[in-house]
């Protein structure tokens, strides 16, 4: 976004807030027939116990402590994602929360915020060094394509379709006094697994079992935060 990173010496007490992991979106590809309208089928699943937000917050804290070793870094819970999005807290390179939230941050001595929010962008999914996909993706989830034949990298076995875990989110570093967004990065990360990885090799959704699905999203979150947070300092 062309914003200035924050010098390490400027960040005294950093609060980390994640509001991008409370739901999972499953996007099923539907071949387009000339229409410019997104034809994909989308299903959202709400997650309890903060979903992936707790994991994302902890991963961001670990990276922030490396980036700003002299700062006190702690996780915060400000408000539900829907409230932050509906209230337009973050727009036009400004952070404008309700007065009560701002007063709470100032009373707690928070000088800066690291805010993780969902990001919507075109579906560009990594597959063998190429980008594939249609429509748009947002937040955390899985893209399911049951049409494109994809081989397993390890065995060469051919499967009909693939499953792509994705993490589309934004990380913003905010100066609480004045509400300035000092740095911001939008992230569109993904991985892919051939349908041939499933036990029957028929449905790409089965390419990863439930534990592997969770681990795949966690890897994307952790690796992207490790990549971008160090860039937010000079």
Where are these regions (language model features)?
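C-terminal/domain-edge helix-coil "capping" segments
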Residues: 1-25, 124, 129-234
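N-terminal segment of the mature soluble domain
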Residues: 30-149, 153, 166-170, 174-184
């Amino acid at each position: 976004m062309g914003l200035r990173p924050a010098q390490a010496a400027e960040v005294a007490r950093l609060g980390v807030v994640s509001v991008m992991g409370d739901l999972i979106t499953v996007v099923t590809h539907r071949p387009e027939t000339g229409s410019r309208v997104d034809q994909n089928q989308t299903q959202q699943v709400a997650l309890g116990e903060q979903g992936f937000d707790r994991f994302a917050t902890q991963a961001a804290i670990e990276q922030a402590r490396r980036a700003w070793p002299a700062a006190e870094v702690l996780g915060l819970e400000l408000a539900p994602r829907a409230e932050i999005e509906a209230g337009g807290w973050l727009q036009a390179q400004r952070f404008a929360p309700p007065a009560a939230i701002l007063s709470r941050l100032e009373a707690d001595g928070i000088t800066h915020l690291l805010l993780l929010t969902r990001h919507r962008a075109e579906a560009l999914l990594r597959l063998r060094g190429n980008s594939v996909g249609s429509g748009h993706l947002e937040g955390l989830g899985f893209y399911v394509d049951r049409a494109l034949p994809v081989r397993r990298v390890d065995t060469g076995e051919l499967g009909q379709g693939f499953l792509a875990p994705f993490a589309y989110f934004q990380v913003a570093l905010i100066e609480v006094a004045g509400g300035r967004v000092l740095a911001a990065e939008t992230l569109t990360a993904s991985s892919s697994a051939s349908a041939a990885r499933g036990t029957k090799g028929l449905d790409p959704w089965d390419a990863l079992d439930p534990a592997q699905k969770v681990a795949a999203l966690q890897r994307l979150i952790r690796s992207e935060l490790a990549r971008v947070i160090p860039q937010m300092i000079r």
